[in-house]
């Protein structure tokens, strides 16, 4: 027992000895630290005395300088000619003082408490470094003396206790060299600059508008071109006006407006065409006599006049401008290397361009001319190759023609030799908003060109616009405006809108197809619907009912669209084609004897073009329209179209009564008529122009809107960085606003005090990838100690959010557009993360721009 007691005493003694040793070591280190602190305070006091010593030395130096300037020196050597500079002295003095002060900063030790660290921080005073020598002005005598005076003044301010860097010109240089951050105002300017840069890059990336070289034909010399190729034959000379009017009335009621319009012809020989063209007309195509629109339009165009031609569908409008175009080109000298086309034909759709090319080839092969069809959705390389070889005629859509004119800086082709321009289906072209593209093409063509406009419908609203392009035009209307050809039999099937409407319409369609197949087993059937989805759905339903068919709409690739038309046009191909109104223009298929409007057209002009796909070139055809009893406006248009085409007896009494009820509603103000092709594209274009103009006025401070009497002064300053500015190009610029408070979409104990939502849905795909990839986000998260989460759902550009859904009696909003949620404990952390994300966006847009420029389009850049 005594032995155990002795052992416990020894253990206690040894432990007390070890504690004493540790305490002594701690006291020794504390004494050393106090000694070092005292020495640093002493050296600091010495440093405080230095400015007084330096000030006295500086006064002595100034006196010596003044004495030297008062007594002229004899220049003996090159060294004596140079003035004494204060720069080396100041540089050496400030560099030594800076090095001394950096040595005084003690290293932190983990054994001291927080109070010791605060005392330690007091001794480490921040000092400024001398500006970079490279940034100082050149060492001329005047500049050097001015710099010395400025530095001396700043040293005096430093001695008096004021900072000589506050208003100095060297502040930015010192901040750059020493890592001193700017004020909050500078940070805001940097953010606005980054936001402006991002906006400009996004607009540049999304702005696909091709710039064409401006041409001033008033300063150019170009050879005159012969336009008049028609001389009236003896049999048509000196005909009294009464007989001319009677002849025009007999020819489908031709109406002419304009001065000096020639008399209509009655046979091809009266045009005086070359034998090669006459052979194609009479032998290859089998056209014995011209149609009414051809009888009047051909002599007018071949007389060199500008024309507005309006005629029924299938009346031969294409041939009315093809023959004068071929005759016009044959009279001109052949193309030389680098010459562009002589004739240009613009169309609103690709299918119409292909149809016109098919008509042109019949003549170009006979007279050894070439034609190039240019439209989007197909490889551009072959089109560029054809233009490089030289082609006399271009047929295409306005967008692709501009692409080719702008390709390779305008070296692919040009329109300097173009003297004949045709706008086919001009009303639809303007209605689709092609006016800017048409103006661009016109700016590249010499002003003395001949221009021809043709269409089956031509609203008065667009007539004034069309006349602005033409010079003293002649307007020719054959068969009336927006009138169905008399060769077409029109029928309307009225469907009750109660019960399963879709099934009722399908059964009615199947019945019509079966009846027609019995009467005409080889006849083609064209079915029109309103929407692309409806076309695909109807194709599936017809296939399920053992009816072979094919579909065409704007959502199909050009290869598929071309294949579908080829399959439908082939004599042994498919009999049924389902299409949207994209096939309502220019589609000319032999044997197409039945057109079915599965969805009633929204206005009469569209109806005229749809049913005009049958009954072409004098042949007969049938048009059947399925309409619901509740579609009063559509029924009124159908009744009006049938009356205008002389089919009053074919109008059912029930249909007429519904139309009369609708007219009463219109008179009472309850309803209004459809405007048809009334220039919606022009109105939308003008609206966009007004929006852009308003934003530009806000940007440049010309007009600032006021709300509730308070001027929104920041609108002009931030216009470039606002979403509205970028939405001009179709992209919403991300917002980087920081909100104080916890984000509602997060939960749990780790929610942060500040957050920011940055929408990235509308950014280009490559830019989004650069921002949200794992490496980029992890680096930003580590650098800023924030949380960044990708949320929401991606929506295609310019698409609207779906409507809220009702589930269990509650309204559930749709998922928001794709965005990044940035969360942080401090506002500065979130602000820094936003800054880094903005930089990543700029990098991503640059990458997207480079890839877009390097897209594989062959040897040429478009």
From Swiss-Prot:
Keyword Repeat in record: no
UniProt-listed InterPro entries: DEAD/DEAH_box_helicase_dom, Helicase_ATP-bd, Helicase_C-like, P-loop_NTPase, RNA-helicase_DEAD-box_CS, RNA_helicase_DEAD_Q_motif
Coiled coil start-end: none
Disordered: annotated span: 1-195
Pfam family, one: Helicase_C
Catalytic activity: ATP + H2O = ADP + phosphate + H(+)
Record motif DEAD box, residues: 424-427
GO molecular function, one term: ATP binding
CDD domains, sorted: DEADc_DDX46 (cd17953), SF2_C_DEAD (cd18787)
Keyword annotations from UniProtKB, A to Z: ATP-binding, Helicase, Hydrolase, mRNA processing, mRNA splicing, Nucleotide-binding, Nucleus
Key word Nucleotide-binding present: yes
Principal subcellular localisation of the protein: nucleus
Assigned EC number: 3.6.4.13
Q motif (motif): residue ranges: 266-295
GO CC entries: nucleus
Domain of life, source organism: Eukaryota
Binding site for ATP: 311-318
Sequence ranges assigned to domain Helicase ATP-binding in this UniProt record: 298-476
Family: Belongs to the DEAD box helicase family. DDX46/PRP5 subfamily.
Function of the molecule: ATP-dependent RNA helicase involved spliceosome assembly and in nuclear splicing. Catalyzes an ATP-dependent conformational change of U2 snRNP. Bridges U1 and U2 snRNPs and enables stable U2 snRNP association with intron RNA.
Protein known as: Pre-mRNA-processing ATP-dependent RNA helicase PRP5
The species this protein was found in: Meyerozyma guilliermondii (strain ATCC 6260 / CBS 566 / DSM 6381 / JCM 1539 / NBRC 10279 / NRRL Y-324) (Yeast)
